[in-house]
Amino acid sequence: MASNVEDTLIKLDRLHSVDYKNDEVQLIKSKIEGIVHQISNRIGELNPILSNSVVHCGSFYHNSKINAPDEFDFLLVLNKFSQPGVCSCKPFEDPEYTHLVSLGIDNTKLNWNPQSVLEWEEDAANKQTLLQATIDSEYRNAVCSCLATMSLPDGISLTTSQKSVRRRFEGGEEFLANFKFSGPALTLLLNWKGVYYPNLNISVDVTYVIAMRGLPSFCNLDKRLPSEHLIVKAGLCADASHELLYCRMLDDTWKQTCSVLENKIICFWFKENDASNVCYRLLKIIRNLVTPVNQLGEAFLKTYALKTLFLYECEQFPDSKFWRTDELSTHLLTIFQKLLSAIQNRFLPNYFNENQNALCYPLDSRPEDENEEGENKFISSVYEAMCKIIEDIISSLEKGLASEQTLKFYFEPGQKIVIKDPDIQDALEKEN
């Protein structure tokens, strides 16, 4: 039987999790998917070389979305470029960046001959760079052409983001009022007018990728897991693929990611036992309620760090019997203790690339002599506030386990700590 603390955690999850059985949630899902498939089809019609398949990704599609159905993630897999033998990879010239590769495209296998590239450029390396830049520019042109004429379903309209100011000064981004490009990603900013959600802003990320068979070069998942591990037995490593995302600022360089595999692994664990999903949602809920944010309301502790810790925990304890709703507080306590240790070390190994840090700035940084005083103060302030909050979370869970307190800490959270990011502040002042 669940204790008071477990009952409280289950109540907290129900209070903040998206109700997937809600008809309006399913209606929003259907309309968003319709928009994305319309974009996908239209891109292929406008430019057949960019014909693509839609892949659903992100928290909404493994039933771990919290608060509202306000974020959707999709990949557009470029079918022709993802065919075997069309694209080849070699390690990036700087070994420090193991997640980057240089791409070669055999355009003769595609019957693709963009005249502006092939007629005027003789150098093979430059030709490759231009070919890859052409993919990106033609994708953007197709998207803009599509959105200019696309009609939206009833109840949904284009809107602008409250974070528009930030988007305007982020490097490498182009803000276009109702949608923006960030590298290979398109973000649509939409608004839903419904009954349960009368005024819901929704962001939809649509990212074009090239799919490659096998695990990426930096990933040792298949080597670190024994053959009897559930992930291996389920064939998730043997049937794995990874994606390439175009890095526009680095010539022919592409970033290797494991978005589809990550999604499959998370869905696999959640299918084994729903208690693990509850635990993962609670990690995000507690983060949202009590951890520090910047002046735009964005958490310094990103979801990816929590996801990374959760995946490691599932890998270490794969038995579905381990994940029980009457032991939620114990699971949360363990994960937050590991999170505190990672933040104190300023390093959390990425789940798929253990040499890469899953913590983001400023949590991955230490004050340095060469930094400006304001930046060092900012890094120290975020670090100290984050450690203090996580220590409080750990203490509340320990007290809950010891005395079965009801964890009012999460139902009556105090005012959030807001720490101003000097980069954002400078840009805001320039805007004004």
UniProtKB/Swiss-Prot annotation:
Top-rank taxon: Eukaryota
Binding sites annotated in the UniProt record for Mg(2+): E71, D73, D205
Effect on the protein of changing D73N: Abolished nucleotidyltransferase activity
Binding site for GTP: D205, K255, Q256, T257, C258, S259, V260, L261, E262
Sorted UniProt keywords: ATP-binding, GTP-binding, Immunity, Innate immunity, Magnesium, Manganese, Metal-binding, Nucleotide-binding, Nucleotidyltransferase, Transferase
Any GO molecular function: 2',3'-cyclic GMP-AMP synthase activity
Cofactors: Mg(2+); Mn(2+)
GO biological process: innate immune response
Pfam families linked to this entry: Mab-21_C
Annotated ATP binding sites: S59, E71, F72, D73, S259, V260, L261, E262, K284, T303, Y304, A305, L306, K307
The enzyme's E.C. designation: 2.7.7.86
Catalytic activity: GTP + ATP = 2',3'-cGAMP + 2 diphosphate; GTP + ATP = pppGp(2'-5')A + diphosphate; pppGp(2'-5')A = 2',3'-cGAMP + diphosphate
InterPro entries: Mab-21_HhH/H2TH-like, MAB21L/cGLR
Similarity-based family: Belongs to the mab-21 family.
UniProt protein name: Cyclic GMP-AMP synthase-like receptor
Organism: Pocillopora damicornis (Cauliflower coral)
Gene: cGLR
